[in-house]
């Protein structure tokens, strides 16, 4: 086992904390044969193992090129991490956008991924200037991430043929806990499409968010509803109404300068017109949203959210909502300075974990794991 760079059992910058907080660098640029590590995803398995996924980019920071899908495991809530494990390496091609989801009935970890030729970039695929496209893949582990099945192509049932670019997550999927779709596995994704001609001009490239889902414990996957245009990377969370309502939280290219949110009351088949909560400021970046707990008759249920709360990719911030995402009255800075993508998890002892991109001079120097009690967050009220 490998002990990562332990920054501290210490306090985070900002305010005095109630308890020691752990920060640990899990992936560091330039180490392990990779130029840089990006796109973190973090999930807890049925036997309480932590899985930290990311992309290992061999030669540059580019989203295109030789990119492998990597994993580290921890069995002690993030104190010690395994050596990196290569989940998928397809030579010079791009294997990425990890989005794991745990089936709580079977214990299987399903890992949704995307693939494209390493010499073909996002702009080319969006513009339709290449015969290549972005495809959707699925792997799984029945042993809590120790080994993985070879990825299989599920593009035919999860992507509209008219779409160009496609991304699973990044982040995590969920399993619906209540209502008529209880047990459904839901994975948030995004896609690009070419809009119709406008006044004789060439078609414009637009973006949308959507979900894919499985009702048979991951054996088959189907395409769910979409939200478009001007939507992008997204994450999904179940609301506390007891009927399985879903909230889709989306990066977007509007001028709102904040996140977009849309609701579904039919398991992700259809979505409402999005609204734009002004509290969730963002620089057009990925974000994470997660349920911390369910209503217990005494206290309201809580949601967690993390992203760079800035007009630029800066100041990774964690927020808390007690009204299913309508308002976010509690917030605290987890990392001051450059920061980008992140992924939240709730650990077995109910402490909160966050795996996030950060650095001193740019946001992509390392992927860091942080762990803290919810009291650390709520003391900022």
Locate each region found by the language model.
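Bacterial N-terminal signal peptides that target proteins for export
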Residues: 1-7
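Hydrophobic h-region of N-terminal signal peptides that target proteins for export
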Residues: 7-18
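Asp-box/BNR beta-propeller blade signature and adjacent active/binding-site loops
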Residues: 17-381
């Amino acid at each position: 086992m490998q002990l990562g760079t332990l920054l501290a059992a210490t306090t985070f910058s900002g305010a005095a904390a109630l308890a020691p907080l752990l920060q640990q660098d899990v992936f560091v640029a330039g180490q392990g044969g990779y130029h840089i590590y990006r796109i973190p995803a973090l999930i807890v398995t049925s036997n309480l193992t932590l899985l930290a996924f990311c992309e290992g980019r061999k030669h540059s920071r580019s989203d295109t090129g030789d990119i492998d899908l990597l994993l580290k495991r921890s069995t002690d809530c993030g104190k010690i991490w395994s050596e990196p494990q290569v989940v998928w390496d397809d030579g010079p091609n791009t294997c990425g956008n990890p989005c794991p989801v745990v089936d709580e009935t079977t214990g299987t970890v399903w890992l949704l991924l995307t693939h494209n030729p390493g010499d073909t970039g996002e702009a080319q695929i969006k513009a339709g200037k290449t015969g290549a496209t972005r495809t959707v893949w699925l792997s799984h582990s029945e042993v809590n991430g120790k080994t993985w099945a070879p990825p299989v192509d599920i593009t035919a049932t999860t992507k509209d043929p008219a779409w160009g670019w496609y991304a699973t997550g990044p982040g995590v999927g969920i399993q619906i806990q209540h209502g008529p779709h209880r047990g459904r596995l839901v994975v948030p994704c995004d896609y690009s499409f070419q809009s119709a001609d406008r006044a004789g001009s060439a078609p414009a490239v637009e973006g949308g968010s959507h979900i894919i889902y499985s009702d048979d414990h991951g054996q088959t996957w189907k395409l769910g509803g979409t939200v478009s245009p001007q939507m992008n990377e997204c994450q999904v969370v179940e609301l506390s109404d007891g009927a399985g309502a879903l909230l889709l939280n989306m990066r977007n290219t509007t001028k709102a300068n904040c996140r977009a949110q849309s609701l579904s009351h039919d398991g992700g088949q259809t979505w409402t017109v999005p609204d734009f909560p002004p509290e969730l400021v963002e620089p057009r970046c990925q974000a994470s949203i997660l349920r911390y707990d369910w209503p217990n008759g005494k206290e309201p249920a809580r949601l967690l959210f993390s992203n760079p709360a800035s007009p630029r990719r800066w100041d990774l911030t964690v927020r808390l909502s007690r009204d299913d995402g309508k308002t976010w009255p509690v917030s605290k800075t987890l990392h001051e300075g450059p920061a980008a993508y992140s992924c939240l998890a709730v650990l077995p002892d109910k402490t909160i974990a966050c795996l996030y991109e950060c650095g001193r001079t740019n946001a992509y120097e390392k992927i860091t794991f942080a762990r803290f009690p919810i009291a650390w967050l709520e003391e900022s009220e």
